[in-house]
Amino acid sequence: GFFALIPKIISSPLFKTLLSAVGSALSSSGEQE
């Protein structure tokens, strides 16, 4: 099912890029406050 795809999604380079982008966005927004 869907949960079987999760490890593949997490290990994908695109997910890592997206995750790092979200993380940097959150940290930058936190610094602005």
From Swiss-Prot:
Pfam family, one: Pardaxin
Highest taxon above the source species: Eukaryota
Main location (coarse class): secreted
UniProt function note: Exhibits unusual shark repellent and surfactant properties. Forms voltage-dependent, ion-permeable channels in membranes. At high concentration causes cell membrane lysis. Causes death in killfish oryzias latipes in 30 minutes at a concentration of 25 micrograms/ml.
Family stated for the protein in its record: Belongs to the pardaxin family.
Domain notes: Consists of a C-terminal hydrophilic region and a predominantly hydrophobic remainder.
Protein name: Pardaxin P-1
Species lineage: Eukaryota, Metazoa, Chordata, Craniata, Vertebrata
